[in-house]
Amino acid sequence: TLGWFDDPLLNTFIHWPTGRLAELMFHELAHQRLYIADDTAFNEAFATAVGRLGAECWLAQRGAAREREEYETDYRRREDFLRLTTATREQLVAVYASTRDAAEKRAEKWRILAELRDRHDQLKRDWGGYGGYDHWFEQDLNNAKLAGISTYHRLVPAFLALYEREGRDFPAFYRAAEVIGQLPPPEREARLRALSSVSASIAANRGGTGRE
């Protein structure tokens, strides 16, 4: 709530791995550092990027090797999950925008969601049986649920690219993010999309996520 209320620290957080808990703290603190009114996608992507970067730096300085390895494994799984859900949402958007009749759209929607579950089962096998997303898949799957994930993560690559562009210097990164945040919404979106394209190009060249 950005200081308006005493935000709870739930007891469930205490059992999180060290890196994940550090990421949560940096994420929430990022909202106090920069918040743009009426732009949830910007705010959450900025905070998510800061959470990731902050956790990396904190673990590099203070974390044990086991904690760093555990965090990287967790992060790779989350990246796999995000790629899966993003691809599924793009499929659904294409179906909704098509000229098919309502019955055909519904049938295709259920086929796509069934495929999503199957692909998650394959990911679980690739992860050695890790079931951290089982609860998410046990709930009702729909486009709104997938859109919520997109809100938090769609623009994260843009902020990671901005951090790299600013020489991995946090003060410079914050200043650059503030400048973008003050732009009119259409220009702000265009600037972030351009940065996302840079991040995608780096990832393609490295065969990874765009970060070393």
Where are these regions (language model features)?
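Acidic/His-rich structured neighborhood in mature extracellular/periplasmic domains
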Residues: 1-78, 93
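Pan-zinc metallopeptidase signature
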Residues: 82-206, 211-212
